[in-house]
Amino acid sequence: MPKTPARSRRASPRRRPAVAASRAAGKAAAIDTSRLLALDDRLYGYLLDETVREPQLMARLRAETRRMPNASMQISPEQAQLMGLLVKLIEARRALEIGTFTGYSALAVALALPADGRLVCCDVSEQWTEIARRYWREAGLADRIDLRLAPAADTLAKLIAAGATRGFDFAFIDADKENYDLYYEQCLKLVRPGGLIAIDNALWHGAVADPACNDADTAAIRALNRKIRDDARVDMVLMPIGDGLLLARPRDPAAVAS
């Protein structure tokens, strides 16, 4: 598909070797990494086989997407399961997705919403989202998902202008990395205090920890990770699941000001 300027998500870089232990610095130097679990292929296979509850429809969509050139843009099944659980835990009714691709993550979120829940999906690709629509119809969720084909920043700006501020419970950001900061700021206006903003690719296949990687996408993710770490407006955690999932919970503005 032809490139579009800062509108649709990009494929992740190839997996890079782990940064050498000798590069460890700061807080990491004080941690006994031998106590951390290494997720090798055997253990990951166990995780998928024994703990992932993936609906058959989602498994078929994942298999179809895997045959596509941009398959690496799809989230992993255990991440999809986590996102569905998070949506239920915060009792979300209205959700946002920035970057839809073939609709796998949207399915995970929409299936977790109540019957009267709504998911607004932002993407620019008719080709990719036509696959998504097909699976959404089969799942009986087409009326629960509002797909808006336009640059995500424009769609979010229109929602804000229309008075949807704090009108959403959950947002998932997985689109063009150079605009991640903009999407984050827009979602902070749209997601209610106590809601959740989930940001994909926060570890970017290890590139964020490699000083030799200074491309625009890596720099943007690095900068946003650091910004959110220091952002008093949210509670946050970066989870090493999938390609790194950063969770930010907007705080009540009154509590932040006090």
Whereabouts are the PLM-identified features?
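A short alpha-helical cap/connector motif
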Residues: 1-172, 177-198, 202-258
